[in-house]
Amino acid sequence: MPASLRSTLYFSGTNALSMALRLIGDPIGKFYSSPDMVTFAKRTNKVSVQKSITGVLVSSNHQVCSEVLKSPNWLSRPFAERLYTGPTTYTPETIHPFLDSIIAIDGAEQRRIKKLMQPVFTPRVIDSWKETSLRIVNDLFSNVKEHGEFDFVASIANPLPLAVICEIIGVPKLYWEKCNIWGRTLAGIGLDLPKNNQELEELEATSLALTDLIGELLAIRRVKPEDDLISLLASAQTDGQKLSDKEIIASVAFTLIAGFETTMNLLSVGTLALLENPDQLALLARNQELIPNFIEEALRLSSPIQFVVRTADSPLVLADGTKAKAGQTVILNLAGANRDPAVFDKPDSFLIQRENAKKNVSFGFGAHHCIGSLLARVEAEVMWRELLRRFPDVESWKLTGTPKYRSGKLIKSLESLPMSFRVSQPSAF
C-alpha cells in the first residue's frame, strides 16, 4: 500500500474514532474534546482511574500517576512504537528524534544511554552553566531596556534556553535559528502528532533536516572533539560498549528539543502567573529566597508536559486498586495530578509559599525522569533573579495584550506574552 494512502486511512480512522468516542461520552472522547488537561481532570474527577471502551485507562490522580511514573514495570516504548510507526514512513534505518531517544526506550538500553549522557547534567556541571545563563540573560535584557514593552516569549523565554542548550550540545551559532524552527515544529507536530498528510510531510522533513545536521556535527567532533555533549557521546563508553551513531544523533536531537521547549514553557507560564497574581509578584520581589519554591509552584500550576503514556509489561495493580492487563495502556494526566485536591490545598490558586509545591509531577519520576530538569530550574532561577534585579518596580509590570497559547494538547506553551514594565536603575543586589 502506498505510504500516502496508508497515512490517509490512518488519519481518517483516528478522526472517526475520536468523534465516535466524543459522542458516547467515553473518557477518551472527553480527553479529545477537553480544551486542556486541567479541564479534562475536572470533568472526570469522580473516580481516580477512568476506563475507555478501547481498553485505555486514564488517571488524573496524583498517587496513581506518581506510582506509575516510578515503576519500571510501566513502559514507554510500546505506545511510542504504535504512535510513531502508525502513519509515518519510519523504517529501521530512519533516525527518529523521539522513538530512538531515551524518552521511548526502557530497561537496560535506556539506562545505558542515560548513564553516558549523565556527566553533562550533573549538579556540578549544571552549576557551571549559571555564568553562561547569566551572560545570555544580560544580553537579552539589554535589548529589552531599549523599548520597555515587548513580547516576553520572543525576547526572553525562547532565546535563553535555546542558546544554553545549543552551547551545551555544541551547535554552532550559525544554526541556532534553524534549530529553533525545527525544534518548535518537532515539539508541536511531533509530540502532539500530525493531523493530516501535510503535517506528516513537514514533520518528516524537519526530522531529517535536524538529524542530518547533528550527523554532520558528530562526524566533525570525531575528528576534532570539543567540550560539548556531542563530543562526550562520541567518545563515551560503558562496559566496553560505545553508542552507535543512530543512538547519539537521536539522543542529541531529543535533548535539543526538550532542552529548550520545556524551559521556555516554564519561563513563560511562570511569568504569566506572576503578572496575573500581583500579590504573589510583590511577595516574590520582597522575598527572593522564595524563587526556588516559586519555580516548583509554576511547574505545578502549569505543567510544561501535560500528560504521558505508559504500558503495563505484565498484569499490574494501580494505586487505587484498578487492575491492568499486560499490554494495557494508561494515560497519566500530569496537569490534573498537579491539581489533585487530595494533595494540594486550593489547587487552582497560585501560591509561591505552598509548602508541598515540590510534590508536582511535571518532570516525572523514575527511569524517565527528565534528565535536564535541574538545568531548567537553574536557568529559570537565574532569569527571574535578574528580571527582579533589573526591573524592581514590580507594580509597573503589566500585560499589554492577551497572551496567546500555541495549539496542542500535550505541551502547555505560550506563543506570545505581551508585557511592559517601567525601566529603572537595577538593584545592586
Model-based region annotation:
Residues M1-F429:
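Cytochrome P450
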